[in-house]
Amino acid sequence: MLIDRLAGAVPAHAWPTITVAGAVMVVVLLMRYLDYDKKVEVPVIGPGGRFTKWLGAIRNVWYAREAIHEVANGQHGKLGFQIPTMTRMDVFICDRALTREYYSLDEDHMSFRAVMSEEFQFKWLLPGQHHDVHRIPNSVIAKALSWQRTRASKADDPFFREFSAEFLYGFQEEMRAFTGCGNKSRLPFFSHAGDHTSGNSGWIAAPCFPLALKVIARLTTKSLFGEPLCRNPKFLDMCCEFGDAVPRDAMILRCFPDFIRPLLARFLAAPRGVKELQTVVLNEITSRRNSREKNPMKDLLDFSINWIDEHSADGWEDWHIADMMTNTVFAALHTSSQLVTHTLFELATRPEYVVPLREEIRQCFALYGNGTKAAIDAMHKMDSFIKETQRCNPLDASALARLVLKPYTFSNGLHVPKGSFIFTPNSPLFEDEQFYEDAKRFDGLRFARMRDDPKRKSDSPMTATSEYSMHFGIGRHACPGRYMVSDEVKLVMVHLLLHYDFAMANFGPRPKNMAFGKFILPDMQAKVWLRKSKDAGNTARVDPGAPDGVASEPS
């Protein structure tokens, strides 16, 4: 082989010199790669010198969140700051007036799309969604979701009834799989059944996040694609694998220089997953085009097909839909699944909330109908508990990410050059007594009581956005899918509360969150104990997935 010949041609005594020279070259290249400039005149948190900031960058791989909280808690100036990462300086604007100034700018100046393209490496992992390519505007999926939300609110429209029924079917299927009675998934962390605990207690220990992910995948694909795809086990696994691969592969690519990324991407899972998903979606589009006159518009895929037909003169084609839908799958799955997991962890370790939440569910079903959208929307205590869970377990320590595409000077004279990455602190706001009384304490009914305050009533729903609650962004880039997230999480929790008792495995404490950089994630391996509820068994049981007025047996 060529390598063997080259090795044989090099004298043995030369190898130590070559090894040292190679190591020096690697260090020089690494230092050159990390030798980015401090471009914005705000303080650097931690080492910020030309050849020392990489020490801070390495620390921030694990502790960026702590650094952001230290600054926001008043240890540094209130205007802004920056922290070194492995590839750049992340600039944080703390001043509220300046924050409003930058997030209100148009995409040509400060781009949300561009920063998402960089964070998730769309150029290599999802090329059709890269910020500078011809792609279906975000406003289209927003309009589609608004259309679906309107359908859900109409009592005579079957959409929400079918959506909640799909949840019940999906939950029962996944529980059968976890208890060894159903089809096994090809995914490694779904391949094992839930464990039956010892004795005759009736408890089953199920992996919480995998169960949440599969159920949310069924609901999301129901909304996006409808049947038969939302009931296709292989397609569901593909969606889950892809949703997991994109953030993981993006993190890997960001650790390497630009010139290495296209080569490395060939060996990653996300590019393969994108092709698999898009092939399935394109085949479904072709099938629907062949039978469109026979079928009404039922889901977001139908809406998108109609949209590109109406705008075909602008060069839109079916593969643009496949790109958009694939991106939506990635964006939707983990957000909802992590929130379900966090919420279940909180409720399993706070049993004092179980009775009032169960009572509210039954009252709302009695007033507005079993499983109706009106009943789900009337559950203010449930909404509050989920939002408080979000407040205490925010995914990202930052919010309102933007990439500066044109140099910009703020009204106070602060200049940010092209290429700067701009953020504002997010999670520190949830610990600020200025916005949340007794902010360090978990209060599951905090936002339910807030509805009685005329000044804060509009900020109390889970889907509301404000400058001190930016889970879903704010302004023109606020997440249009937040209403679907709310419905999905509530359907899961309503069903569990009506039909199950639950606790953490071995009646232990809440599993600790996992921190990485600016992010925290729930423990993906933790198990929750589930048991058919005796309390539910002694009452007339109702279910979000059953027809109005019909009691359903627990799965």
UniProtKB/Swiss-Prot annotation:
PANTHER family: CYTOCHROME P450, P450, PUTATIVE (EUROFUNG)-RELATED. GO terms for molecular function: heme binding; iron ion binding; monooxygenase activity; oxidoreductase activity, acting on paired donors, with incorporation or reduction of molecular oxygen. It is found in: Membrane. GO terms for cellular component: membrane. PROSITE patterns: CYTOCHROME_P450. This is Cytochrome P450 monooxygeanse terQ. It is an enzyme of class 1 (oxidoreductase). InterPro entries: Cyt_P450 (IPR001128), Cyt_P450_CS (IPR017972), Cyt_P450_E_grp-IV (IPR002403), Cyt_P450_sf (IPR036396). Belongs to the cytochrome P450 family. Keywords: Heme, Iron, Membrane, Metal-binding, Monooxygenase, Oxidoreductase, Transmembrane, Transmembrane helix. The gene is terQ. Disruption phenotype: Impairs the production of terpendole E and leads to the accumulation of paspaline and 13-desoxypaxilline. The keyword Transmembrane applies.
